[in-house]
Regions:
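Mobile amphipathic helical/loop "lid" adjacent to a hydrophobic cofactor/ligand pocket
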Residues: 4-7, 14-135, 139-140
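Conserved donor sugar-nucleotide recognition element shared by glycan-biosynthetic enzymes
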Residues: 134-135, 163, 340
Length: 343
C-alpha cells in the first residue's frame, strides 16, 4: 500500500500568522496543500453534537432545532465575535476571560458548549483552566487567526507528505552530526565559551521546553529563573489510531478537530480531543486515521497504531508576562532560547 506519513505533533500553519515559517519552507522548496480547520463538539451531558462549519452541520443532530439554549449559544457566538476586541480596550492585562464573560452576561451554553471547548482544544488546556486565561491573550489570538469573523479567515495549510519533509531538508547539511537520544545533563557558561556536559562550544541554543532549559543550566541567572520558571508545561497523552468511535456519532458532524467530554466544566483533567487526520492532511485512503489526546481508555486496543507523550505550555497570567521578557535572557551569556512557550 505504500507509506503514509501522519503528523501527530505539528500539523497546520497559515501564511498570515507564520511568516518566518513560510519563508523557511519556500527557501527549502517544500510542497504544501490546503487544509481544513473545522471543529466539532460532542458532549455526553447534555447529549449534544454539532459541527460549526455550516448551518446544516450545526443542526446535524435534529434535536438542536428544538433547543432554545442552542439558539442562545449561536446568538452569543455572534455577539462575542462582534464585541470581543473592543471589550479588552483599556482593561488590565490580568483581566481574565471569566471576568469578561461575567461582565457582559454571556450564557452558560455559549461558555460551556462553545468557548471552553474551543479554548481547551487550541491550547491543550484542562477545561477548568480555560476561563482563567487572560482575556487579552485569548481574544488577540482569536482576532489574529480570523476566528472573530466568518469572512476573513486565513487559509490553513499542511506540508504535503507530512512535516518530516521539511525536517529532512533543513538537516541535510549537517545530518551526520546530529546526536539522537543523547541526554544533555548540564550546561555551564564562561566568559569566552560554554560547555555541554564538558564539551566546549562558542554559543548554545536551547530549542527545548522552558522547564527543561532551567533544569540543565548550571548557574541560571535570577532573570532566567524568573522567566523560564513562569511557564509550566502539562503532559498530554497522544494516540494514533483508526477507531472512529472517538469521532462524532454522526458522520456528517466529523471535523478536523473533534472535542469530546462527559461534563463540560467539571473535568479538571486534560482536554480530550481527536484530530481526523484524513481531513487535516487530505488523505485519500480507506482507513480513517485519528490522533487522540488524553482519552486512550476509550480507544479499541486493536486499532492503536502508536502512543506518544507530548508536553504543551500552559499559558497563565505569569507565563504571558514572562513571554515579553525574551530579550532579558536570550542573546546574553552566549545563550539563546527558542520554543513554543514564547507564544
Amino acid at each position: 500500500h505504500g507509506t503514509i506519513n501522519i503528523d501527530t505533533g505539528f500539523i497546520v500553519y497559515n501564511e498570515r500568522n507564520y511568516p518566518n515559517f513560510v519563508k523557511l519552507i519556500q527557501e527549502l522548496d517544500i510542497q504544501t496543500q490546503p487544509s481544513s480547520m473545522s471543529f466539532s463538539v460532542r458532549l455526553a451531558n447534555p447529549d449534544l453534537e454539532y459541527n460549526g462549519s455550516t448551518l446544516r452541520q450545526l443542526f446535524v443532530d435534529k434535536r438542536n432545532l428544538f433547543r432554545p439554549w442552542f439558539y442562545k449559544m449561536l446568538r452569543d457566538i455572534l455577539r462575542f465575535n462582534r464585541m470581543a476586541a473592543a471589550a479588552i480596550d483599556g482593561r488590565p492585562t490580568n483581566w481574565t476571560l471569566r471576568e469578561l464573560l461575567d461582565e457582559h452576561g454571556f450564557s452558560q451554553p455559549f461558555i460551556e458548549y462553545y468557548l471552553v471547548p474551543m479554548g481547551a482544544a487550541i491550547w491543550s488546556t484542562p477545561v477548568t483552566q480555560v476561563l482563567d486565561i487572560p482575556a487579552h491573550f485569548f481574544i488577540q489570538f482569536f482576532e489574529n487567526h480570523g476566528m472573530l469573523t466568518v469572512d476573513d479567515r486565513p487559509e490553513w495549510r499542511v506540508i504535503k507528505g507530512g512535516s518530516c519533509q521539511y525536517v529532512k531538508e533543513i538537516i541535510k547539511p549537517f545530518a551526520n552530526r546530529i546526536r539522537l537520544n543523547h541526554t544533555v545533563r548540564q550546561v555551564e557558561r564562561f566568559p569566552d565559551h560554554v560547555t555541554v556536559d564538558g564539551e566546549r562550544f562558542d554559543e548554545i541554543v536551547f530549542a527545548c521546553h522552558s522547564d527543561q532549559a532551567l533544569e540543565i543550566l548550571k548557574d541560571p541567572s535570577p532573570a532566567e529563573r524568573s522567566v523560564l520558571g513562569a511557564i509550566p508545561y502539562r503532559v498530554n497523552e497522544v494516540v494514533l489510531h483508526t477507531d472512529t468511535s472517538l469521532l462524532p456519532r454522526r458522520r456528517q458532524a466529523w471535523a478536523a478537530w473533534n472535542y469530546h467530554s462527559s461534563d463540560p466544566l467539571e473535568n479538571n483533567g486534560p482536554v480530550a480531543l481527536t484530530y481526523n487526520m484524513n481531513i487535516l492532511q487530505a488523505l485519500n485512503v480507506p482507513d480513517t486515521f485519528c490522533v487522540t489526546l488524553n482519552d486512550s481508555s476509550s480507544i479499541n486496543d486493536e486499532d492503536v497504531l502508536e502512543r506518544f507523550e507530548y508536553h504543551h505550555p500552559l499559558f497563565t497570567l505569569e507565563g504571558i508576562a514572562a513571554q515579553k521578557r525574551h530579550a532579558e535572557i536570550s542573546g546574553i551569556a552566549r545563550t539563546h532560547y527558542c520554543g513554543a512557550y514564547w507564544g
